[in-house]
């Protein structure tokens, strides 16, 4: 499991923590998705919207569960994409309530980063609460030739900053956050592999 400190001015700064202020936030990237499995940067977008995870992804999530079970996690925040919901269910089952939070969604770069509206998510996951989500909870802006609204890096970084402020303000701890590669990169400077777990200090 990777461990990271806060990134300031391009430097990675590690902190000593007392037992009270000990880092207890874990960032988990989703398992391999159907989009991940076929994506090639030199080829056209395969146009797989809100991609589910693959059989390999299911295996990755079950393996991650063995690691995560050893951690002190009492809260769970999950991105509303299908791949993160599936990953979280395989890792955590019904052990913890899901807090669905669109702030931890992926940067919209490709078709897989266009989500499903709340009524569709509620149909597929009737035991979870999506009522607080906007109909279009992913980035919405000027569309490119694919009909996709790419989220600028500046907006991604601002969203990551807002989320860090939320973690600090609410004194979030003992928490796993099932999210995405670019969002985790915006928080930490590290783009994790599928189902990699990163210990995160928001301070």
PLM regions and their residue ranges:
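Active-site-adjacent alpha-helix immediately C-terminal to a catalytic or transition-state-stabilizing loop
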Residues: 161-203
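Catalytic metal-binding/acid-base residues of hydrolase active sites
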Residues: 32, 82, 104-105, 182-184
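Conserved histidine-centered catalytic loops in small-molecule metabolism enzymes
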Residues: 5-8, 17-21, 71-103, 122-138, ...
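Short beta-strand scaffold positions
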Residues: 78-79, 158, 178-179
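Short glycine-/acidic-enriched loop or helix-start segments at secondary-structure transitions
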Residues: 37-38, 87-88, 110, 186-189
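Phosphate-handling substructures
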Residues: 37-38, 42, 46-52, 94-158
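Active-site-proximal alpha-helix that buttresses catalytic centers in soluble enzyme cores
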Residues: 23-24, 28-100, 195
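A generic secondary-structure signal
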Residues: 63-67, 124, 162-166
């Amino acid at each position: 499991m990777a461990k990271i400190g806060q990134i300031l001015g391009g430097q990675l700064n590690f902190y000593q923590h007392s037992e009270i202020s000990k880092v207890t936030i874990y960032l988990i990237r989703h398992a391999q998705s159907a989009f991940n499995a076929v994506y090639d940067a030199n080829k056209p977008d395969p146009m797989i919207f809100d991609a589910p995870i693959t059989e390999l992804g299911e295996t990755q999530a079950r393996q991650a569960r063995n690691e995560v079970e050893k951690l002190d996690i009492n809260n769970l925040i999950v991105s509303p994409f299908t791949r993160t919901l599936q990953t979280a269910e395989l890792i955590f089952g019904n052990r913890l309530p899901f807090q669905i939070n669109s702030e931890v969604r992926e940067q919209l770069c490709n078709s897989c980063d266009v989500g499903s509206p709340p009524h569709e998510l509620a149909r597929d996951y009737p035991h979870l609460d999506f009522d607080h989500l906007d109909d279009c909870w992913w980035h919405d802006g000027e569309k490119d030739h694919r009909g996709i609204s790419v989220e600028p890096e500046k907006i991604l970084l601002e969203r990551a900053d807002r989320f860090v402020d939320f973690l600090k303000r609410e004194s979030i701890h003992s928490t796993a956050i099932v999210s995405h590669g670019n969002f985790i990169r915006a928080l930490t400077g590290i783009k994790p592999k599928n189902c990699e777990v990163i210990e995160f200090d928001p301070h």
